[in-house]
């Protein structure tokens, strides 16, 4: 686990903001924002990447302002891979699920290798974390999740995601499970509107939470789903009471960013 992640964990009792940058380098205004004590992390996007040399320089600029800044990216694989040119193109995790149905042992081995590969490419550039893996089950309902999910079966999910996490750990990267308590059943796109999962919370706990419960000891963070569940509980606005019980260990909680319109 990176030193920046340890610093973030030590400060996690107080809410911290995760910032983003407009372009390929850090502006003077952005340096001031990064230096603010309320800034706990930085998430990078495709707009922040041109090539390895530029990215390394961008990270250096950030570290010059805040050596302990947690630098993150969504580098799951498939359609959610922010850095592509010059990086290994990772498959969607559903490809591992399909492989699992044919050869579970080989699929689990490949999941570990992909997790280590993804993490090692980032840590070599001094990037602390990729927000991965997705632990949402694929019900065939959500186009937002879809092939980002390893599988629709909880046991297969636990096996594959657990191996992926092991691979990340081998490369020195902490894992973040998302989207707690499960985002695969909703249809609405949370980037555009607030999704509603009409199922009772008890059903959610029985069907969607087992991967989070099983893998909780290996997760350093969780990302809540921006859903309304159980007659009005908002998962990322105070409805995380199941998480207080299930994820009973030190854990960063990273909510969805402000620019998602559904929140």
Model regions: which residues?
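N-terminal/domain-start segments enriched in small and hydrophobic, helix-friendly residues
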Residues: 29-39, 45-47, 175
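Short, flexible segments with low predicted structural confidence
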Residues: 5-6, 34, 186-187
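Enzymes and membrane/adaptor proteins characterized by extended Gly/Ser/Thr/Asp/Glu-rich
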Residues: 38-157, 185-197, 225-231, 259-263
